[in-house]
Structure formats: structure tokens, C-alpha cells
Amino acid sequence: MSRTIMLIPISAGVGLTSVSMGLLRAMERKGVSVSFYKPIAQPRTGDDQPDLTSTVMSRNSDIKIGQPMSMSAAETLIGSEKMDVLLETVVERYNQINKDAEVTLIEGLVPTRKHPFANQVNAEIANTLGAEIVFVATPGTDNPTQLKERIEVACSNFGGTKNKSISGVIINKLNAPVDEAGRTRPDLSEIFDDADHAKQANLEVMQIFNTSPIRVLGCVPWSIDLIATRAIDMAKHLKAEIINQGDINTRRIKSITFCARSIPNMIEHFKPGSLLVTSADRPDVIVAAALAAMNGVEIGAVLLTGGYDIPRELVSLCKPAFDTGLPIFKAQGNTWQTSLNLQSFSLEVPADDKERIEFISEHVASHIDGPWVDSLTEGAQASRRLSPPAFRYQLTELARSANKRIVLPEGDEPRTVKAAAICAERGIAQCVLLGNPEEIKRVAAQQGVELGSGIEIIDPKVAQEKYVARLVELRKSKGMTEVVAREQLEDTVVLGTMMLERNEVDGLVSGAVHTTANTIRPPLQIIKTAPNASLVSSIFFMLLPDQVLVYGDCAINPDPNAEQLAEIAIQSADSAAAFGIEPRVAMISYSTGTSGQGADVDKVREATRIAKEKRPDLVIDGPLQYDAAIMENVAASKAPNSPVAGKATVFVFPDLNTGNTTYKAVQRSADLVSIGPMLQGMRKPVNDLSRGALVDDIVYTIALTAIQAGQEQK
């Protein structure tokens, strides 16, 4: 039997959309099938505009989403005393999306001056749908007693705290900066220069838990990253003319500085994520911003006012700085008018800002009560699919429990530094950065990254000498001498590999700068393959909208023979099982079953036979065409008796050309996230990165490596 949860805000400005996204993510992490419904649209501007939460959900997830009624239609029915008609429409649309869901999440109306009927309508909808009520509140400047009283007042509108339908409350924006009236304002006043001096309640989580009249289901701390908008969104709001595009689509604004002072008094504000607002006739500010950019500081953007043009000579002088990605745009009007326009900028997350939506979802989900989320599926059949959010959550949890040390030879590479900081902050792994300590700290400062506990920095020049003798011993049969060993140890991948060989670290991740060959060659020479492995292969985890698939081998073996292909299939199946994916292995070919002949398909057929013989416990079939392996309707006609066709989770390709082409085609055409390649068959875990890897790619590769290290010791 499915359950219905209704989120009801006790006031305006509680961050309802963020809580909805986070609660959905928390349930998806557990593999719960969810649907979402906002009965009445409530856009910030214009009563007949699309609803924000529904739009965000529809563009960024594959869950079923109910069609909201427009606010004007709802107001007409309420004004005509036709609440019964409104509720019948709500029930009709609710029934369209809750049939196959274990949990349906309902988002209630926010009580505002324009919508004073919100509490009444919320109560009627909750009662009609038999929903369990979860209030959403924000403390503002309340002390625990005042917050308790506000929650009690909210409960009184729904039958009081003894109402068994009230499940609890989620506290959002804990310890956020607030204005003089105690409101957490949804505009840029939160990130102006004086934000550091704004009032903060500084409530302790335990105080809230101890005083709340109902169960606290989550306490979500405020973070500046939750409202860090893209530079392009700011430019669009101001209808600004773009002078230099740069990284305008990806740079984030975390603070705003009006450059009215002299340069020496503003240097501290030239920092990552800052929007520098200056009159276009202040060349000193523009040049100072250019110097900061040339030094690696990722300033959010420069906003010019006053209607002046930048002199051509100045543009030419600053061009190298502009080429670093520094966005520059010009607003009409003077600085005062621009300031007023900025105040009206909405910090609601745009539906196309996938990066921020992902951060908000993960941040909120991480602060929702886990046992309560687990309880939502009691009495309902658990979903067997492993969704991408569930898989990513499982990765981080398994990595945390493994608690491993991972060496990163490219320790001064900016993406690697960021990833290491994230891993340390989340407890994913203890990262060891190889590189000049001063250079690493400089790169971290430029990126606005703090290198706290959980990160160790090792200077290669200091550490190299102690590995010389051991490297000579290991490679003596290949003619290794002390002179050559010292030369090779100048390569940080070789140094990291020696640390791994000496059990000083548990795994190695490289490749953001190094080629695949340069990353893999030293471990193959020094670490070698696992005792039960005849080769090293790789897999990618492909995060489809509703499940995670494994593709192998798409990175290492150009043209494996039948024996090698069988080994790749077995390795890939074991890796899938280790990461919570039930392995159903499809051996891919251009032909299904016995319909085709030729050397290529015969190789796949023989590999399938060998794999079955070696591992009769595996569910494996082949040769299968890709469509027969993944689509049930095709499988029904092409391979009706196959235990794998139509429901394969592990896809083993006949050669590197086929595998790599398929992986990239699926990833790019479907705009999917993939994690990998993860190497299999090494005696100790070593993983290679793509040189185009994003920070998140590196984080999850570190997590994979930590998990592999934990499994090696079992």
C-alpha cells in the first residue's frame, strides 16, 4: 500500500522547493519509487505562470509528476464556494500519478498575503488524500521556545499536536543570516558585503530536538552554496550587454561588492565567486580584477555600470585575463539603479541549473532523518531498481565505512584539489596529495577551497629517496639501477605506486593530466595483477534515469580473445554485485543467438560458453544484440527463452572499438552521467580518470577506489 506525505510550510520563505527536492532525493537514495504532486501552482510572479517545483522536477527527474491547477482557477473555485469541485480535481490528478508509487509527495501552498486561504486549502487537501503531514519551518531569529510556539500554532490549524496524521517537522535554513525583521529574505541581501554581519540565530540542533512539540524529521543548515546563482542568470535579470562571455554559464556568484573604494581597500573582496560591481570608467578596478584572474582567482563576474564603454586599449591589455573565463557584462543605468535592480533578483533555483539542483537535493537529503525515510516503505514492496541517486548514495556510504587512504599523484591540479577537499569534508576517503605544498595551498586558495583534516600533502622531492632501494629490488630483473630509479620516482604516478606497494596508501587515482598509459603502466609493472586475474579490464557505471548499468570493457583491451572476453565478463559481473547491482550479463554482438555466423560472433559465443563453465552461478547469455539485451519487447521476439534478454544489467562488448563507441554514444545522446573507468584485476586498486573529468567525476572515482580497497581486504 502506498503512502502519501504532504509538506506544509508554516510561513513564507521556508525554502519549500528545496525541501521537496531533498526529501525526494532522500527517498530515491533508498530505492523508493516516488511520485510528486503540487495540487495548485504557486509561482513567485504571475498567477498563471508554471509552478517552480513541478517544473524543476519534470526537467531533472524521471518520476511521475501531477499536473497542478492554476492559481487563478483555484481562486475562482474558492471564491465561488466550490471547494468540493477543487478537491475532486485534486483527487483525479492525484490518482493519475500514485498508482505505481510507494510514496507520493504532495507540496502544499505557502501562506502569503495574496493567498490567505493557504492553510484552509492545505488542511482540506491533506484530509481528502489521507496524507501524513510534515511541516516545514525556518527558525529566523527565534530561540528554541519561540520556534516551539510557532510549530504549535501551525499544528493547531490541523487538529493539534495529538493529530496522528502529523508526522513531524523539517527545520530548514538553520542559522541562516536574516534581516532586521528576522526574515531569511529570498533575495541578494543575503550575499551583499555586510552578510557577515547579519543576525544569526545560532540554534543548536539538539536544542530544537529537545524542545519541539512534534518529531523533528530533519534539520537542514543554511549554506551560501544553496543560493549561489550563475553569472548568466544575473546578466539576464539585468538585461545586461555581455562584454566578455567567458565562463558566464558556469561561474557562481556568492558575494557582491560595490567597488566604490580605492583598490587597497578592496583587495580582500577580489575572491572566488564575487560579483564586482563598478562604474565602467574605473579602469583601476578592471585592471585589478584582470590581475586577480591571471593569478588564478575565479572571480564570479564583473558588472559594469554607468553606460560607458571600456577603452579599446584597456580591452587589449586585459585580453589574457578575459581569456581565463572572466565574465564581464554591462548594465544600463548607474550604480544606484543597478543596486535596486539587484535587490529584486530572485534566488529561486532555475529549472535548467542542474548543478545547483543537484547540490540542493544532496544537501537537504543528507540532513533528513534516515530511520523515518526507511519507515516510509513499511508495508510496501521495496523497489528492486537501483536508481542513480541510490547508487551514488551507496557509493559514498560504502566509501565512508571503508575509511581508506587514496593517493592522488596530480596533487596540484585544481580539479583534484577540489575533489580531495570534498572527499575529506564528506568522509569519503583520506586523500594524500603529491606535490609542492606551497603550490597546492596556492591552488586551493585560488579555488576557494579549505584543506582541512583528512587531507595530507607530501612533497615528492622529500619522499622520493626512501623508495629508491625498493624500486631497484622490484625491477632489478629489468635492469633497474639507482640512477634510473631516482629518475622514474620524479614521476608522481611512480611515486604514488610505490606508496601503494608499501601499503602506505590503499589506492591510487590519476589521469586528470596524465594519459591512461602513464597512469596504468607503473602499477602494472610494480603492483601487477591480482592472483586470480589473467588480465586487467575496465567498466563504466552508466547512470540511466531509472537504473544503473555496467559497461565493459570500454577502455583497456583492444581486441580480447574468447578466453579474455570470458574473464572480462566474470570480472564485470563480480564488480556489479560488489556495488549492489544484480548482475545479469549480456555478451553483446551484432547477432542474437544462432542467427549469425562468422569469426566475431563465434568469439562471443565461445566466450559465453567459457564464462558459464567457469562460473555456473552467474546469469549470463550471448551472443545478444544490444536492443535484445535491454528492451523487453525486442527480447520477446528475438530471445524469448533468454534469462538475460530484456533485463540485462551488465553489458560486455566484443572489443574496445565497439565498447568505447557505444559508451560515448549513449552518454552523449542521452545526456547521462557515467562513472569510470574502474579498473578490474589489479592486485591493488588503481583507477584512471578522463583528462576532461569534472570534479564530481574525480570524487566518485576516489569513492570507487576506496570501496575496492575495502573489498581487497575481505
Curated annotation (Swiss-Prot):
Pathway: Metabolic intermediate biosynthesis; acetyl-CoA biosynthesis; acetyl-CoA from acetate: step 2/2. GO terms for cellular component: cytoplasm. It comes from the Bacteria. It is an enzyme of class 2 (transferase). SUPFAM superfamilies: HprK N-terminal domain-like, Isocitrate/Isopropylmalate dehydrogenase-like, P-loop containing nucleoside triphosphate hydrolases. InterPro entries: DRTGG, P-Actrans_bac, P-loop_NTPase, P_AcTrfase, P_AcTrfase_dom1, P_AcTrfase_dom2, Phos_Acetyltrans/Butyryltrans, PTA_PTB. GO terms for molecular function: phosphate acetyltransferase activity. Residues 390-714 are annotated as: Phosphate acetyltransferase. It catalyses: acetyl-CoA + phosphate = acetyl phosphate + CoA. Homohexamer. Involved in acetate metabolism. The N-terminal region seems to be important for proper quaternary structure. The C-terminal region contains the substrate-binding site. In the N-terminal section; belongs to the CobB/CobQ family. This is Phosphate acetyltransferase. It comes from Vibrio cholerae serotype O1 (strain ATCC 39315 / El Tor Inaba N16961).
